[in-house]
């Protein structure tokens, strides 16, 4: 007698999430212990792929979208309400979105090697670092962290954002397509600072016992970065997909996030974080655009950045 075929849950996620050092492998094995299913991660860029596939996407779940691109993602019309209790979330701001469910969060920040320079405490201090101190950033057209920086600068400087980029340009060693390449240049010693997140130093402390990498905390406030999950409307595995969305808020999932995705878990309080995270300095305030504001201003903000850096 043939064995019944177990269902497959297809989850789209970024490369870093599914890599051997990311949370993907452990999440896969833990969920499969209880779901009687085969969880298959499909790694790669998310939004361009979803735009291309539209209603024909093979995904049941999408993991790794962020708040600066949710307007575009929402307008695709391919997601259904998650139907989970948002009050279970422990975030620095209220969350009432019915489509997108955060699974982790952090703040955009510049991380510096303190053996090379003292981290600046403001955007203006960043400009005034010694001439030999260089930073690496990511391209906002291909990187969600790069986009967060563009919007962060735009929120702080408004109509003067282009002028700020002109002043910062000499400090930028290079612009990379993605976060991994930029962070690699930083850890290889090519630059003293890199655009990353306030939680990034936790990796160096916990894994390398290196306390020389520190996030610069700016007095102007920092741009929050939420990573999101969404359930695909056309999924043939609606029950499994709903189970996975529940799983995201469970301690089993949330416990994995800090030490594999190096971010704060979305459904746990500070008391539940590993001590290396609860001890990290955090910004006193968050500055950000709403979903609609970010969608409306992104093109202009990128153009100001591009024009300034091409001069």
Protein language model annotation of sequence segments:
Residues 232-289:
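Mature extracytoplasmic/periplasmic domains
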Residues 274-311:
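Extracellular/periplasmic bilobal clamshell ligand-binding domains
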Residues 68-72, 187, 191-212, 261:
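A ligand-binding cleft/hinge motif common to bilobed small-molecule-binding domains
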Residues 109-116, 154, 225-238, 256-259:
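A bilobed periplasmic-binding-protein/Venus flytrap-type ligand-binding module shared by bacterial periplasmic
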Residues 6-8, 12-23, 48, 57-191:
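Extracytoplasmic ligand-binding site segments that recognize negatively charged/polar headgroups
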């Amino acid at each position: 007698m043939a064995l019944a075929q177990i269902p497959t849950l297809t989850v789209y996620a970024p490369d870093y999430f599914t890599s051997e050092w990311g949370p993907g492998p452990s999440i896969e094995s833990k969920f499969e212990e209880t779901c009687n299913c085969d969880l298959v991660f499909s790694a790669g860029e998310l939004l361009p792929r979803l735009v291309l596939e539209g209603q024909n996407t093979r995904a049941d779940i999408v993991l790794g979208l962020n708040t600066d691109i949710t307007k575009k993602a929402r307008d695709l019309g391919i997601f259904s309400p998650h139907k989970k209790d948002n009050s279970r979330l422990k975030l620095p701001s209220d969350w009432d979105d019915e489509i997108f469910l955060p699974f982790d969060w952090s703040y955009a920040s510049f991380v510096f090697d303190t053996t090379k320079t003292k981290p600046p405490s403001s955007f203006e201090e960043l400009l005034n670092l010694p001439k030999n101190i260089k930073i690496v950033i990511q391209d906002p057209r291909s990187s969600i962290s790069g986009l967060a920086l563009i919007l962060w600068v735009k929120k702080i400087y408004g109509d003067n954002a282009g002028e700020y980029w002109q002043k910062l340009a000499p400090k930028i060693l290079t612009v990379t397509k993605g976060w991994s390449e930029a962070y690699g240049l930083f850890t290889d010693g090519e630059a003293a600072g890199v655009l990353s997140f306030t939680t990034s130093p936790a990796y160096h402390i916990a894994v390398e016992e290196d306390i020389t990498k520190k996030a610069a905390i700016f007095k102007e406030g920092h741009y929050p970065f939420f990573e999101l999950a969404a359930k695909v409307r056309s999924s043939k595995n609606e029950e499994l997909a709903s189970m996975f969305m529940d799983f995201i808020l469970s301690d089993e999932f949330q416990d994995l996030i800090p030490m594999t995705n190096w971010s704060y878990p979305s459904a746990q309080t500070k008391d539940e974080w590993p001590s290396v995270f609860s001890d990290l300095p955090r910004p006193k305030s968050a500055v950000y655009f709403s979903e609609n504001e970010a969608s409306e201003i992104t093109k202009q903000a990128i153009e100001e950045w591009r024009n300034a850096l091409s001069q």
